[in-house]
C-alpha cells in the first residue's frame, strides 16, 4: 500500500514522503489517525496544495514541544507514596501518576508522553524520567519519590 505522509512518523518518514507500508498498518493506524493519505494522483495534487499549511502546522507543534521541554528541564517533581521500612512502595508510580504530577506543577503532559523504559517505579528515591513531547523533542524530568 502506497501512502503520502501528512506528518513525521517515527521509523517511517517525514512530511510529504511517499512510503510503501503493509496494508494493515496503513488502514488501521496511519489513515484513521490522519497521519497519511492514499498515494493517488488526486491526493498527490491536493497534498502539494496543502504542503505549506501542513509544514507550518508541523513547525508550530515542534516549537510548542520545544517550549514545553524548556519548562520541563527546570522542573523537579516530588511524589509522595506509602512505603515500607526498606523503601519498597506499596503499589507503584506509573506514567499516569507522573503525568498528573507534572500537570499539577504547571506543564501540561499527557500520560502517553511519559516514558518509563524500566517499568513502573517501585522504590523510594530519585529518578530521571524521559518525556517524549514530539518525534524530535524529548525532555528529562527529575522525579523524587518519598515515603508518606
Swiss-Prot record:
GO terms for biological process: translation. It comes from Pseudomonas putida (strain W619). SUPFAM superfamilies: L9 N-domain-like (SSF55658), Ribosomal protein L9 C-domain (SSF55653). This is Large ribosomal subunit protein bL9. NCBIfam families: L9 (TIGR00158). Binds to the 23S rRNA. Belongs to the bacterial ribosomal protein bL9 family. InterPro entries: Ribosomal_bL9, Ribosomal_bL9/RNase_H1_N, Ribosomal_bL9_bac/chp, Ribosomal_bL9_C, Ribosomal_bL9_C_sf, Ribosomal_bL9_N, Ribosomal_bL9_N_sf. GO terms for cellular component: ribonucleoprotein complex; ribosome. One of its GO terms (molecular function) is rRNA binding. The keyword Ribonucleoprotein applies. Keywords: Ribonucleoprotein, Ribosomal protein, RNA-binding, rRNA-binding. It comes from the Bacteria.
Amino acid at each position: 500500500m502506497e501512502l503520502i505522509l501528512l506528518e513525521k512518523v517515527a521509523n517511517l518518514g517525514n512530511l510529504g514522503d511517499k512510503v510503501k507500508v503493509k496494508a494493515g498498518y496503513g488502514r488501521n493506524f496511519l489513515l484513521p489517525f490522519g497521519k497519511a493519505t492514499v498515494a493517488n494522483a488526486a491526493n498527490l495534487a491536493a497534498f502539494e496544495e496543502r504542503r505549506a499549511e501542513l509544514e507550518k502546522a508541523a513547525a508550530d507543534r515542534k516549537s510548542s514541544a520545544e517550549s514545553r521541554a524548556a519548562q520541563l528541564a527546570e522542573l523537579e517533581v516530588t511524589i509522595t507514596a506509602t512505603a515500607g521500612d526498606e523503601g519498597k512502595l506499596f503499589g507503584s508510580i506509573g506514567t499516569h501518576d507522573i503525568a498528573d504530577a507534572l500537570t499539577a506543577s504547571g506543564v501540561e503532559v499527557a500520560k502517553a508522553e511519559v516514558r518509563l523504559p524500566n517499568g513502573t517505579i517501585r522504590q523510594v528515591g530519585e529518578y530521571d524520567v524521559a518525556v517524549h513531547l514530539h518525534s524530535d523533542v524529548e525532555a528529562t524530568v527529575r522525579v523524587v519519590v518519598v515515603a508518606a
